């Protein structure tokens, strides 16, 4: 019998509570300034303004070491990259445009480094696209509810619950390092084991890792940063 075997190793790393650094301040200020502008000024004539916005920004950096039969076949380390997301609701907490309660969002490209002007501009573009989508979704929802009214029990349930303002900034306890020599030695040692198993015709060992930072800010006063790491 022949087998295809792939081994992937994961070691989770945790984070701790800390204060904002300079990069955090740039990112959060760009998010909050554009979010406030959108809440106050984003409106088409005769249409609703957004009452709630949520911006997220994720920065990520990753690597992969792959080997087979005692040798390293590939090593890859990516530069930092970033992507943002815009969520928006029109109406109010009792009745908004969220159709099917899926919390739809629009993706927004972000710069590799923390650049206030670029981050703010890209959230502006994402907010504009999300506003137009939200108007369409709200019209669809209103038309559906007109044809299918809520029951008395359903009518008292709000579309969205307002949460208390909170600020939580987490930083990792230790620096995230990629020891290429050590990782390649591990891959070589583990992948060499399969030389003795002739019935395994295609084997590989991979060690992958990712360092990620997730930022979130909402008009409800929620400010969050969370590091996500494995290697």
Question: What are the roles of these predicted feature ranges?
Answer:
Residues 1-5:
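Positively charged n-region of N-terminal signal peptides that target proteins for export
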Residues 6-16:
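Bacterial N-terminal signal peptides
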Residues 18-231:
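Active-site bordering "gate/hinge" segments
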């Amino acid at each position: 019998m022949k087998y295809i075997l792939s081994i992937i190793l994961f070691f989770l790393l945790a984070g701790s509570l800390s204060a904002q650094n300079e990069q955090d301040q740039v990112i959060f200020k760009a998010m909050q300034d554009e979010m406030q502008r959108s809440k106050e000024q984003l409106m088409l004539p005769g249409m609703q303004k957004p009452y709630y916005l949520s911006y997220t920004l994720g920065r990520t950096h990753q690597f992969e070491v792959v080997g087979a039969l005692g040798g390293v076949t590939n090593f890859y380390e990516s530069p930092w990259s970033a992507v943002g997301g815009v969520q928006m609701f029109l109406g109010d907490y009792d009745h908004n445009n969220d159709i099917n309660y899926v919390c739809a969002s629009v993706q927004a490209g972000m710069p590799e480094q923390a650049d206030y002007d670029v981050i703010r501009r890209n959230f502006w573009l994402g907010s504009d696209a999300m506003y137009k989508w939200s108007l369409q979704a709200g019209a669809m929802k209103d038309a559906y509810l007109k044809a299918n009214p809520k029951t008395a029990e359903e009518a008292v349930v709000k579309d969205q619950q307002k949460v208390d303002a909170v600020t939580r900034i987490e930083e990792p306890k230790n620096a995230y390092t990629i020891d290429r020599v050590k990782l390649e030695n591990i891959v070589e040692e583990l992948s060499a084991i399969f030389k003795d198993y002739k019935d395994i015709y295609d084997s590989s060992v991979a060690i992958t890792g990712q360092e990620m930072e997730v930022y979130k800010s909402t008009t409800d006063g929620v400010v969050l940063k969370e590091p996500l790491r494995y290697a």
